[in-house]
Swiss-Prot record:
InterPro entries: H-NS-like_N, H-NS_C_dom, H-NS_C_dom_sf, Histone_HNS, Histone_HNS_N. It comes from Proteus vulgaris. Homodimer that oligomerizes on DNA into higher-order complexes that form bridges between disparate regions of DNA compacting it. Interacts with YmoA and other similar proteins. The keyword Cytoplasm applies. A DNA-binding protein implicated in transcriptional repression and chromosome organization and compaction. Binds nucleation sites in AT-rich DNA and bridges them, forming higher-order nucleoprotein complexes and condensing the chromosome. As many horizontally transferred genes are AT-rich, it plays a central role in silencing foreign genes. A subset of genes are repressed by H-NS in association with other proteins. Gene3D superfamilies: H-NS histone-like proteins, Histone-like protein H-NS, C-terminal domain. It is found in: Cytoplasm, Nucleoid. This is DNA-binding protein H-NS. GO terms for cellular component: cytosol; nucleoid; protein-DNA complex. Keywords: Cytoplasm, DNA-binding, Repressor, Transcription, Transcription regulation. GO terms for molecular function: bent DNA binding; DNA-binding transcription repressor activity; minor groove of adenine-thymine-rich DNA binding; protein dimerization activity; structural constituent of chromatin; transcription cis-regulatory region binding.
Length: 134
């Protein structure tokens, strides 16, 4: 809630402000506030009417499906089966081969950070990345 709304919601603050404001101004403010409240009520009623209309339509369609001998859950399952998820991409093939600290030969695709073993070999042993190509 914003500070201005907190002030409007506090009766003590309103009374203090009302003492310094003319009655005509207070009545104008009251009229404007009533207009805003009425608009908001109408919006809420319209939204509620839309929700009720949607529920009635859903119930109508449910009844039509049942009358035709179709179970609504079967329809949902059929709709769910037709949707396809995001396809996984294929794993990238290995591009580099190296021997780790345990003496095992391993591979690396070349994606991500340079592996510590390869980085150490490049920096300390003077090798290049091309030396590790498969």
């Amino acid at each position: 809630m914003s500070e201005s709304l907190k002030i409007l919601n506090n009766i003590r603050t309103l009374r203090a402000q009302a003492r310094e404001t003319s009655l005509e101004t207070l009545e104008e403010m009251l009229e404007k506030l009533e207009v805003v409240v009425n608009e908001r009520r109408e919006e809420e009623q319209a939204m509620q009417a839309e929700i009720e209309e949607r529920q009635q339509k859903l119930q109508k369609y449910r009844e039509l499906l049942i009358a035709d001998g179709i179970d609504p859950t079967d329809l949902l399952e059929a709709a769910g089966a037709s949707k396809t998820g995001r396809a996984k991409r294929a794993a990238r093939p290995a591009k580099y081969s190296y021997v780790d600290d345990n003496g095992e030969t391993k591979t690396w695709t070349g994606q991500g950070r340079t592996l510590a073993v390869i980085k150490r070999a490049i920096e300390e042993e003077g090798k290049s990345l091309e030396d590790f190509l498969i």
